[in-house]
């Protein structure tokens, strides 16, 4: 595959890094991680990790792309590091919207200065931030997402997710990120296209306790559809694996629903019920968590329902919301 990046070098890892020490031991100085360390975001010396999943208060933490945007425009990160290492190694695990947008910001840092006032680019960066902070359950106007080219820009990721991980995963991830970057360049140059939202998520279970279990059918736009329908607390089946295991997300749409939809308690209970309880399968932040995207969960959605119902019922009772 020809190299389509010059400022950065995308490095797709075979595993996520366990913590900061693991990352620093494993990669060269002047390296950047994008949602690839099971640890807090930030920087340590000449190592940076843009993330908003582990060890954070979700609603008080920017998306990885917004962190990268500020680091490039205000912090002059790329300008400062390029004299020491070029290309700059950027470690990734997947090619979701936040990672793709972060990679574009790092690779095309010079374009940010030229087009920083571009309303559509600014809108996409800001709207990605809102959606990601809320785990995809931000109340949206679906037509606005289509009209402002958000769905078109990230269509390559949607296609990759719909088809699942293929052989040659690293090439698939790099190609997906490159395609999204190409579309962002087209956006800046007035050549953006249009992609309608066609996701039809299935509600598998609607709890009297105010949460739903939904099957995304492999389409990342499903969560936007669910948010537009007014769902706020969600256990989401992302995919069924060929191994028979599952990938889930657990999302609380409002930080103020902690007393009635306790994500941390739910995740701890799901972890305890796994077939490999000593392997860390479930984790995340206070508002959005899920099962490990590498190993997957052994629990089907009916088992999650049976575990979640008494926890949510008790939480609502203690909060005085059991009758609502």
What are these regions (language model features)?
Residues 1-59:
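Short, surface-exposed loop/strand segments
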Residues 2, 21-30, 41-46, 178-324:
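Gly/His-enriched, cation/cofactor- and phosphate-binding structural elements
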Residues 5-11, 29-34, 82-94, 211-215:
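Short hydrophobic beta-strand segments
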Residues 34-35, 91, 104, 249-251, ...:
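Residues in well-ordered beta-strands of folded domains
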Residues 51, 90-92, 283:
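Divalent metal-coordination and catalytic microenvironments
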Residues 58-151:
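Active-site histidine-anchored catalytic micro-motif
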Residues 131-195:
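Long, charge-rich alpha-helical interaction segments
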């Amino acid at each position: 595959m020809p190299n389509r990046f010059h400022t950065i070098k995308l490095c797709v890892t075979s595993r996520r890094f366990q913590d900061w020490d693991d990352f620093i031991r494993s990669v060269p100085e002047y390296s950047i991680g994008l949602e690839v360390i099971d640890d807090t975001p930030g920087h340590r010396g000449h190592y940076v990790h843009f993330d908003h999943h582990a060890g954070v208060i979700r609603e008080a933490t920017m998306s990885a792309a917004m962190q990268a945007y500020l680091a490039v425009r205000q912090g002059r990160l790329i300008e400062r590091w390029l004299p020491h290492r070029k290309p700059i190694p950027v470690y990734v695990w997947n090619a979701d919207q936040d990672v793709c947008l972060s990679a574009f910001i790092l690779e095309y840092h010079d374009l940010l200065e030229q087009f920083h006032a571009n309303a559509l680019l600014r809108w996409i960066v800001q709207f990605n931030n809102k959606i990601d902070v809320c785990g995809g359950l931000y109340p949206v106007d679906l037509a606005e997402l289509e009209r402002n080219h958000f769905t078109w820009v990230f269509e390559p990721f949607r296609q990759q997710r719909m088809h699942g991980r293929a052989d040659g995963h690293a090439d698939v991830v790099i190609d997906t990120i490159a395609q999204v970057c190409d579309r962002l360049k087209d956006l800046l140059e007035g050549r953006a296209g249009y992609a309608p939202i066609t996701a039809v998520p299935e509600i598998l279970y609607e709890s009297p306790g105010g949460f739903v279990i939904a099957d995304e059918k492999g389409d990342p736009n499903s969560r936007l559809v669910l948010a537009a329908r007014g769902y706020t607390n969600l256990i989401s089946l992302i995919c069924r694996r060929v191994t028979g295991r599952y990938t889930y997300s657990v999302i609380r749409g409002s930080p103020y629903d902690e007393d009635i939809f306790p994500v941390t308690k739910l995740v701890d209970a799901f972890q305890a019920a796994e077939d490999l309880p000593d392997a860390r399968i479930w984790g995340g932040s206070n508002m959005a968590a899920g099962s490990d995207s590498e190993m997957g969960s052994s629990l089907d959605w009916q088992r999650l329902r049976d575990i979640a119902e008494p926890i949510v019922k008790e939480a609502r009772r203690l909060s005085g919301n059991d009758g609502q």
